[in-house]
C-alpha cells in the first residue's frame, strides 16, 4: 500500500467539479491511501469524501513565510507520496512541485504543467473546460476515467429533513449563487430567471 496525494484548493464549486476526478483517481488506486491537500473552509467537508483517506491542511500562507513552507514540506515528505495529482494547477502548486519533486514528470507529478499537449500553450489549454482539462491530465497520467466529466457531489449532502420539519421549510428552495469576486466571467447570469 502506497500514499497518493491530491491537491485541490479553490472554491466550493472547484471542490464539487473535482469530485469526479477524485473518484477516478481512487478507482485507479484501490490499494493505496489517498490524501488531499486543501484549505480550512473545505477540511471538514473533504473528510466526508469516501474516496479520501484523510485531509492535510494547507493554510496557504505567503511563499515568503519560510518557516510555514518548511513545516508543510516536511509534513508532506513524511508521507512518502509516490504520486501527486495536482488538480489545482496554480502557480502555488507549481511552486510546491519545485520544492517536493523538482524534476518529476507526469509519472510522479500529474498537473497541467507535466501533461500539457505537445504544441499547446497553457493559455490555450486553459480555454477548455476544467472537466475536459482534468480528463486529459488524468488520461495522460495513466488514469482510466469514468467519472471526471460527470462529478458526483452527493457524498457531501446532509439529511436536513428534521430542520425542514421544525421550521416548516418544505415549500422553500435555497439557491447559493456564489462566485469569486475577481472572476466575474464565471458568474452565471440567469439566477433571476431561474427564481421566477
Predicted regions and their residues:
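Catalytic machinery of carbohydrate-active enzymes
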Residues: 1-196
Amino acid at each position: 500500500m502506497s500514499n497518493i496525494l491530491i491537491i485541490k484548493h479553490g472554491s466550493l464549486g472547484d471542490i464539487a467539479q473535482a469530485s469526479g476526478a477524485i473518484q477516478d483517481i481512487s478507482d485507479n488506486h484501490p490499494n493505496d491511501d489517498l490524501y488531499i491537500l486543501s484549505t480550512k473552509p473545505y477540511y471538514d467537508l473533504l473528510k466526508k469524501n469516501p474516496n479520501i483517506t484523510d485531509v492535510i491542511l494547507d493554510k496557504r500562507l505567503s511563499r515568503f513565510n519560510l518557516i510555514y513552507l518548511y513545516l508543510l514540506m516536511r509534513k508532506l515528505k513524511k508521507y512518502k507520496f509516490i504520486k501527486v495529482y495536482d488538480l489545482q494547477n496554480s502557480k502555488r502548486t507549481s511552486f510546491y512541485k519545485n520544492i517536493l519533486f523538482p524534476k518529476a514528470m507526469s509519472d510522479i507529478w500529474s498537473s497541467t504543467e507535466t501533461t500539457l499537449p505537445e504544441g499547446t500553450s497553457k493559455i490555450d489549454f486553459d480555454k477548455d473546460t476544467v472537466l475536459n482539462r482534468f480528463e486529459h491530465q488524468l488520461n495522460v497520467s495513466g488514469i482510466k476515467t469514468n467519472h471526471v466529466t460527470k462529478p458526483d457531489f452527493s457524498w457531501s449532502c446532509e439529511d436536513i429533513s428534521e430542520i425542514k420539519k421544525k421550521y416548516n421549510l418544505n415549500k422553500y428552495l435555497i439557491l447559493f449563487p456564489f462566485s469569486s469576486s475577481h472572476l466575474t466571467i464565471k458568474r452565471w447570469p440567469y439566477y433571476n430567471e431561474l427564481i421566477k
